[in-house]
Amino acid sequence: MSMKQTSVFLLIQLICYFRPGACGKVLVWPTEYSHWINIKIILNELAQRGHEVTVLVSSASILIEPTKESSINFEIYSVPLSKSDLEYSFAKWIDEWTRDFETLSIWTYYSKMQKVFNEYSDVVENLCKALIWNKSLMKKLQGSQFDVILADAVGPCGELLAELLKTPLVYSLRFCPGYRCEKFSGGLPLPPSYVPVVLSELSDRMTFVERVKNMLQMLYFDFWFQPFKEKSWSQFYSDVLGRPTTLTEMMGKADIWLIRTFWDLEFPHPFLPNFDFVGGLHCKPAKPLPREMEEFVQSSGEHGVVVFSLGSMVKNLTEEKANVVASALAQIPQKVVWRFDGKKPDTLGSNTRLYKWIPQNDLLGHPKTKAFVAHGGTNGIYEAIYHGIPIVGIPLFADQPDNINHMVAKGAAVRVDFSILSTTGLLTALKIVMNDPSYKENAMRLSRIHHDQPVKPLDRAVFWIEYVMRHKGAKHLRSTLHDLSWFQYHSLDVIGFLLLCVVGVVFIITKFCLFCCRKTANMGKKKKE
């Protein structure tokens, strides 16, 4: 730290000392890749505000690298696998998920996805067990008296830590497959009549056939698909706590859910007071580019630049795919900045420059950038929205197809399927996005929506974490639906009671009418006699 930074940090600590409750202790259960990139931004902001932040890091962590210079504390715990083991697993899952997924039937695709999630669940459970069974570390954590736990909901264990340490819990989440966690643990009402099931790749304007498809997928996710091995996790949690419980029940105790999206990307749907959108919290104004890159961008003249990146998890393309992409890029008048780590394609044009890493946000914010060719990861999508850049989407896995389809529905993107990627198809998509002004106009419209918020997403995320610390939880924001059984939630008991009342009234009226009829008939007979 510089002298100036040290002085500011000491000043904050003094403020915390004289204002008890102004600063607190935050324990973090993170996950890898873009999830860590997002949550790290929140942690840095919390640390700058004087909070003591502690991150739990496994010895096999891929991106989370503890540094002495950081204002964040790191607690490293040993796990029975190495960093290379974890990297291999992620690479294998990505390969299995992306291999020809567009050509598979929807049920075969979901079957493959379930297999990937089962294996992922096993790995995360092993990481969690290594932490929970580390008695010395758990004793240290219990003695630290944390004010809040911040956890990524796609990696279970944060809810168990919150229960063991008797600490409020805040989730950071993009989504669970089929909205399973949000619905069953968070209690979020998501009617399938107009809310497309996440991963369904549908929009909110569905035809009858699409609503049938949406309903079937909702039933599949609700009653069959499991993002985590529910039975295994529930048994583990029950053994640790010494009482019967379930993963769904434990996750349902979260105080606040910070969802990494916003109404610029998301379709309208019901919300609850303990949910809030913080999509794009990592976005910021563009900084100057490195000198060499700036010179290349400026050399594009009036044609401008296209930015190409398939994210951090996809290291390179096959040689065949790389040549297909390079051939298409070589035929456009724009200069191209391509994030690529592999053998130089034979068809690479003179207008294209390869980089192992690019300052993506700064490039997207450059006035000469005309389009963004991307895989559709949420971070990249939000950087494009922030700067108002139209997208050519080549989705690969996870939330990417859904994200790209949302942008297509909003008129700010064109989708190209990876499995049938061709030079002609990519070239056509690029020309459409850059030559049709409606794509730029729609991208700018989404950008205006994103910027028109009373509080910035990052400040909102920090506010809710501090809110939970100040109030020692936020149970007053949780709906009482968590205390209802499924038949009470759907009012089946009330409907049954009312139906019984109606049947009873009809029965009594019928009996009364029959009685009156018989009475009248008997009186008639007596008069005749």
UniProtKB/Swiss-Prot annotation:
One of its GO terms (molecular function) is glucuronosyltransferase activity. Glycans are attached at residues 134, 316. Induction: By phenobarbital. GO terms for cellular component: endoplasmic reticulum membrane. CDD domains: GT1_Gtf-like. Keywords: Endoplasmic reticulum, Glycoprotein, Glycosyltransferase, Membrane, Signal, Transferase, Transmembrane, Transmembrane helix. Its EC number is 2.4.1.17. PROSITE patterns: UDPGT (PS00375). It catalyses: glucuronate acceptor + UDP-alpha-D-glucuronate = acceptor beta-D-glucuronoside + UDP + H(+); 17beta-estradiol + UDP-alpha-D-glucuronate = 17beta-estradiol 17-O-(beta-D-glucuronate) + UDP + H(+). It is a single-pass membrane protein. The chain crosses the membrane at residues 494-510. It comes from the Eukaryota. Residues 1-23 form the signal peptide. GO terms for biological process: biphenyl catabolic process; cellular response to ethanol; cellular response to glucocorticoid stimulus; cellular response to growth hormone stimulus; cellular response to testosterone stimulus; estrogen metabolic process; response to lipopolysaccharide; xenobiotic metabolic process. It holds the Pfam family UDPGT. It is an enzyme of class 2 (transferase). Its main location: endoplasmic reticulum. It is found in: Endoplasmic reticulum membrane. UDP-glucuronosyltransferase (UGT) that catalyzes phase II biotransformation reactions in which lipophilic substrates are conjugated with glucuronic acid to increase the metabolite's water solubility, thereby facilitating excretion into either the urine or bile. Essential for the elimination and detoxification of drugs, xenobiotics and endogenous compounds. Catalyzes the glucuronidation of the endogenous estrogen hormone estradiol. Belongs to the UDP-glycosyltransferase family. This is UDP-glucuronosyltransferase 2B1. It comes from Rattus norvegicus. The lineage of its organism: Eukaryota, Metazoa, Chordata, Craniata, Vertebrata.
